[in-house]
Amino acid sequence: GFNVDLNNQKVCDGMNIHAAGVEKTYLNYRFSQPYRVSTQHSERFIPDVNFPRQYSVRVNPFLKFPDGILKKPAFDPYIFHTDTSTQYWQSRASLVSSSEGGTMDFSESSRVRKFLISGAESYNRFNSLAHNGYGERQCFFPSNNLHIGALMRALFSNLEEWVADGELPLDSIYPKIYDETLVEASSMFLPSLIKENFRAALNGSGDMEFGSRVKFNRGVVDLLAPEVIANHKVLVPAVDQFGHDIAGMETHGMESDI
């Protein structure tokens, strides 16, 4: 089971799950490859976003059985789930907290806090330089070199106090459907500089049929080119007049005047 060792003891009291979005490790499958994640242009046919997608237990809307990531209260850790803007566009992070149809927010386990780090990539080295990709001609805009280390250090300290001392942590800070901070990409308000050259492409998602031996976590993939049986509506954070995600935590670099 998740977070249980061979002596039936809890392994981790707390975890910081970073830059995952809704994607899970491709593990506990025959011939699995734990380092694989699906992107817009590679690894399309792996079961990394199939149910469950939330920490709390809920009923699978397609197969009608309950499942969740945290389902063993005696062994469940405290979790800080941190995503950046990249995870909403690439790793379908909206599905961690909202329905597959993009119509409603889900409440979350009391053992979980979720945070969006606004305007950032997954991670960057301190003092890294922006670039336009390979040969400086791969990307229209320069890459994002925002460093999030200081903010992550503060969050990790808060998680440690929760685990070690029992002090209640920060409330979750992430975009939601109900307050219109989580929206469809096609309806975003964007600054004119970005809007003129932006194609609003994001990584799609859907429940896929890998064969009967994948259902109920049995772990054998029979259909190597699976059929999408139900598409998901992937949403993204609404942005302000500067193009920064509204409902997230801003680093000191974003808060400084230029």
Report each predicted region and the residues it spans.
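C-terminal His-loop and adjacent cap/lid subdomain of alpha/beta-hydrolase
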Residues: 1-258
